[in-house]
Curated annotation (Swiss-Prot):
This is ATP synthase subunit delta. F-type ATPases have 2 components, F(1) - the catalytic core - and F(0) - the membrane proton channel. F(1) has five subunits: alpha(3), beta(3), gamma(1), delta(1), epsilon(1). F(0) has three main subunits: a(1), b(2) and c(10-14). The alpha and beta chains form an alternating ring which encloses part of the gamma chain. F(1) is attached to F(0) by a central stalk formed by the gamma and epsilon chains, while a peripheral stalk is formed by the delta and b chains. It is a peripheral membrane protein. GO terms for cellular component: plasma membrane; proton-transporting ATP synthase complex. It is found in: Cell inner membrane. PROSITE patterns: ATPASE_DELTA.
Amino acid sequence: MAQNGSESGSTLGGVAGRYASALFELAREERAVDAVSEGLDRFDALLKESADLQRLVRSPVFTSEDQVKAIDAVLARAGITGLAANFIRLSAANRRLFVLPDMIRAFRALVRESKGIVQAEVRLAETPSDAVLEEIKASLRDVARAEVDVDLRIDPSLIGGIVVKVGSRMVDASLRTKLNSIRLAMRDAR
């Protein structure tokens, strides 16, 4: 496991990292990494869509029994079973649901690392065409010399251009940054 400032090194600290590492090792032993990933992705999507589920996960008001009952109902409705479901239940029983989103991120980082995939965050001012997105992915693959998983984010405040972050490196070629640089240069020239 990389601990040298790479994405997984920074993601795997604390409780989230310990839980994610334990889950990853168990999933790998049971040859269930893809199934666990799918279950966690499904739960993460539900979490992002449901304000009620977010409250359940974040609120200290609910007892662990209440959380486990509610989580059981959510898992059953979503069809999440096996190791992923047991992990989510364990998080609820141990009153760690509030850390679950970080655990899921850390697990994803371990999966990417095990498959030799690099995570890249790409921010653009507007949604790119499929062709442009493929060009960006191809360029990132060439630079990283690895398969790249692109997390695309739309940020209209960039005005134009692109901001790319891979690991601890970031390249900001946005129009907003260029305009700010010009503004500073002109102010200093006075």
